[in-house]
């Protein structure tokens, strides 16, 4: 096994044999499962390589809103016999969504978060300092919301993955 963090000081207290300085060297560790809990960019950059060798559980599920990346990851997993595990995270009942995906016509998810906990860096329409009351930041598809708020809507991505997909899952984010 291994632990990687782009900030070496955050893993400085761990035994050195556990720390992997360069994530590209993951194959030297022979892991049975790689769990990502950093950022969707880890999946974009390393996801296919991970799945070439082992099972993968990304917690930053918004990366899967990129249809091409999703297709490549699913294809790699099929070809290599590895698995992508989708954690339920904050959403209970993903198994029921998956079981009923052929019967659902519409799936909606609405989330309210305090503005101080939102990353609005990719939101050209809102400035956190200007939000003073309940404000709908976004309403649309999961495919649209995920790249706009990649650190805040992993639950939306989980619902889309388990259910009827990124284009047909309706999302609302309220500050």
Question: Where are each of the predicted segments found?
Answer:
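Beta-loop-alpha module in the N-terminal Rossmann-like domain of NAD(P)-dependent dehydrogenases
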Residues: 21-25, 29-50, 63-66
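General beta-strand structural signal in soluble alpha/beta enzymes
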Residues: 36, 58, 83-88
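Active-site-lining helix/loop region of Rossmann-like oxidoreductase modules
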Residues: 84-85, 90-175
């Amino acid at each position: 096994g291994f632990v990687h963090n782009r900030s070496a000081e955050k893993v400085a207290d761990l035994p050195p044999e556990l720390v992997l300085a360069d994530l590209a060297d993951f194959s030297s560790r022979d892991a049975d499962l790689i769990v990502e809990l950093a950022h969707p960019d880890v999946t974009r950059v390393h996801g296919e390589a991970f799945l070439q060798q082992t099972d993968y559980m990304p917690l930053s599920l918004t990366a899967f809103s990129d249809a091409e990346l999703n297709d490549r990851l699913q294809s790699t997993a099929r070809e290599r016999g590895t698995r992508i595990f989708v954690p339920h995270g904050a959403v209970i009942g993903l198994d029921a969504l998956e079981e009923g995906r052929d019967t659902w016509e519409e799936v909606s998810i609405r989330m309210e978060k305090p503005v101080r906990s939102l990353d609005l860096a990719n939101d050209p329409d809102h400035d956190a300092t200007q939000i003073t009351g309940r404000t709908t930041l976004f309403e649309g598809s999961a495919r649209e919301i995920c790249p706009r708020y990649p650190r805040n809507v992993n639950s939306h991505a989980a619902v889309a993955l388990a259910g009827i997909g990124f284009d047909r899952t309706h999302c609302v984010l309220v500050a």
